[in-house]
Swiss-Prot record:
Belongs to the cytochrome P450 family. InterPro entries: Cyt_P450 (IPR001128), Cyt_P450_CS (IPR017972), Cyt_P450_E_grp-I (IPR002401), Cyt_P450_sf (IPR036396), Cytochrome_P450_fam2 (IPR050182). This is Putative inactive cytochrome P450 2G1. Its cofactor is heme. Keywords: Heme, Iron, Metal-binding.
């Protein structure tokens, strides 16, 4: 089920519910892009900016699962895919969250057909509110038993 994994990754990348990581504290004076960041400065990583970086994602604002496929159609890791943050402060529940997402997604699709109650062209996932978290619009979905 490599394509299922690819689709889940692309959903996480595109929807980006938590665009800001947990704060980090600079432990020594650091030069970054011509700026001095003094020791003790709090830095908030903007994960959303990485997840939509055209340097790493060919179509950053579109749903394009091929972002995570290699030429042979196999899953390909992408260093810019950091929905759970990175480094020492990565989400401790990442492995469990990935497993649960996969199981929930696959069991739902195995047992139901999904039908949108709104024409697909009218669905806009642009966040209604953005800040520490992104709040996307809600849409109704009909699950039809297979």
């Amino acid at each position: 089920m490599p394509y299922t994994d690819v689709v889940i990754h692309e959903i996480q990348r595109l929807v980006d519910i938590v665009p800001m990581g947990v704060p980090h504290n600079i432990i020594q004076d650091t030069q970054f892009r011509g700026y001095l960041l003094p020791k003790g400065t709090d830095v908030f990583p903007l994960l959303g900016s990485v997840l939509k970086d055209p340097k790493y994602f060919r179509y950053p604002d579109a749903f394009y699962p091929q972002h995570f496929l290699d030429e042979q159609g196999r899953f390909k890791k992408n260093e810019a895919f950091v929905p759970f943050s990175s480094g020492k402060r990565i989400c401790l529940g990442e492995a469990m969250a990935r497993m649960e997402l996969f199981l929930y997604f696959t069991s739902t699709l195995q047992n139901f057909s999904l039908c949108s109650l709104v024409p697909l062209v009218d669905i806009d996932i642009t966040p209604k509110l953005s800040g520490f978290g992104n709040i996307t619009p809600t849409y109704e979905l009909c699950l039809v038993a297979r």
